């Protein structure tokens, strides 16, 4: 909830939801300043009653220096809750050096452990990873093109190597002939057998 009178938030956006061990997790970007500035933080709240009520906000990553960490997606797999969050640096311009970072929930402490940068090159995750028939996972998102001298922010996917969630290969999806490149390509994928 955007409540500058109580939590100081000037901006919240990008809810990611996941069920994990009977609890509902919600992540979102939170900023007391403007969107896409270094004060952006990744926050999480947890519900034990299916979303009727929520626990207090927990900071997954507040960044440091010019690093802002924002919204992303979850994956509950093999007993572990992963989070893949969009992040950026913001000292030279609004935001650049965009990338995705991974986090794992420590069930004992209920804190999030950073696993570092997992997809570089402007990739921002927008959909939870889906497992493909070859055993690899595909995560849909977009590639912020400004840092690469390109117009537009085209749809993109990141593909894992099996269950290794610490290294993803990013592929930008080019626009069809005749379609302008000036798009905001938030994307999603549907996996049906060997078809994506």
Regions found by a protein language model. Give the residues of each.
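Beta-rich carbohydrate-recognition and catalytic domains
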Residues: 1-10, 19-67, 76-186, 190-196
